[in-house]
């Protein structure tokens, strides 16, 4: 063979489809390409004999560099490619048990041979090694979570064993992991911390707040359709407090379902948001300052009272024809207003204070009240009539509180007839 006339050609090997082996080969090659660039085309023939009848001897003299691999010639037609190991980065993704993703604020430490470092919080929910720290083959490392993101708890598992073997393969706690672009991926989930909240129920009495028991509140959460669904209901205790726990982020609302006996019911509908870190966002001002837990406050008012006077004769039968006058705070009313005779008199919407009930007209044949009747309604809802406490005056629901009074008139005793001897 005339070596002066030798030419160099190129042949491309591609991984066959559905081939899982690590060996690629081509047989019966008859043509080569003159170039190895984008104009690659197998048009260069391979004659078996030269012009002197001598057989050509073909061999591969070199392999064009494959990025990321080193080359080794085994024989005239066989080359071995070995993937070059590059030190590895670590990327931890932090998620929440609530379904929220990419939590910031966690702290991870990595230790190993000649390595003791803290991962960098990238502020996008991922954590990676400092730029000057990479994981080497043939080494073992321990990853430790030392601090959970805000609003979350450290799990029972806080350490992970990372091994990079001599071949550069990676395993975490014994399970093989696939790297991408020299990065080891690892997702870690933290449990969302249960968030305690409260609402305190009170009323004003003599210029001071007085806590109220037996009010019922509902904690509601907005669903995907935009409507609120009740999560829990609780009654206030003797300190006026209802206690709730929030187990996931979302949009919430606190609603009063029923007030204490004798008091109005005001829904409130206090809307607030809990973000993925367990922080509450609320635009209202009714927040208890310096409370150990986030606490809403909710004021209720004593409902007005209705006084119903039943006029009766001394035999307890209804007696019509009387008139009554009630005077007190913002009140000076005489009934009946229309002049029609009645045995029932209703004075409505009375607020706490002292009242005087006077019988201004007595039916003929009966004795009127000797003294006016004193009625006292206190700010705590208790009622006395002439110093005697009246029971069962507080009413639930929307109806006013009710005071009932029976006023009995005695019939006049007729004077004896007198006369002389005729």
Residue ranges of predicted features:
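Solvent-exposed loop/turn and edge beta-strand elements of beta-rich ligand-binding domains
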Residues: 1-422
């Amino acid at each position: 063979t005339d070596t002066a006339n030798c030419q160099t050609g190129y042949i491309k090997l591609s991984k066959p489809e559905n081939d899982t082996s690590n060996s690629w080969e081509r047989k019966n090659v008859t043509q080569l390409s003159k170039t190895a660039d984008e104009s690659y085309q197998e048009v260069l023939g391979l004659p078996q004999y030269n012009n002197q009848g001598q057989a050509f001897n073909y061999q591969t003299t070199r392999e064009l560099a494959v990025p990321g691999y080193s080359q080794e010639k085994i024989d005239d037609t066989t080359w071995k490619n070995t993937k070059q190991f590059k030190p590895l980065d670590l990327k931890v993704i932090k998620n929440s048990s609530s379904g929220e993703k990419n939590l910031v604020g966690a702290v991870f430490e990595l230790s190993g041979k000649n390595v003791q470092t803290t991962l960098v919080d990238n502020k996008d929910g991922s954590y990676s090694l400092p730029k000057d720290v990479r994981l080497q083959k043939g080494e073992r490392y321990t990853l430790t979570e030392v601090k959970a993101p805000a609003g979350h708890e450290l799990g029972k598992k806080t350490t992970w064993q990372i091994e990079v073997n001599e071949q550069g393969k990676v395993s975490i706690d014994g399970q093989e992991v696939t790297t991408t672009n020299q990065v080891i991926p690892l997702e870690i989930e933290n449990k969302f911390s249960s968030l305690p909240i409260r609402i305190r129920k009170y009323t004003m009495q003599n210029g001071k707040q007085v806590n109220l028991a037996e009010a019922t509140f509902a904690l509601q959460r907005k669903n995907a359709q935009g409507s609120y669904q009740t999560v829990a209901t609780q009654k206030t205790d003797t300190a006026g407090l209802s206690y709730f726990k929030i187990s996931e982020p979302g949009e919430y609302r606190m609603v009063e379902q029923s007030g204490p006996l004798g008091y109005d019911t005001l829904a409130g509908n206090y809307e607030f948001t809990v973000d993925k870190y367990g922080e509450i966002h609320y635009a209202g001002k009714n927040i208890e300052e310096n409370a150990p837990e986030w606490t809403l406050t909710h004021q209720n008012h004593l409902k007005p009272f209705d006084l119903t006077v039943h006029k009766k004769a001394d035999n307890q039968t209804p007696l019509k024809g009387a008139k009554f006058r009630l005077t007190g705070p913002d009140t000076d009313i005489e009934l009946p207003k229309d002049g029609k005779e009645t045995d029932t008199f209703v004075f409505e919407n009375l607020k706490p204070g002292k009242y005087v009930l006077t019988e201004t007209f007595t039916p003929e044949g009966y004795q009127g009240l000797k003294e006016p009747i004193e009625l006292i309604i206190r700010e705590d809802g208790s009622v006395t009539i002439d110093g005697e406490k009246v029971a069962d005056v507080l009413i639930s629901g929307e109806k006013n509180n009710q005071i009932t009074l029976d006023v009995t008139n005695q019939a006049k005793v007729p004077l004896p007839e007198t006369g002389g001897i005729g």
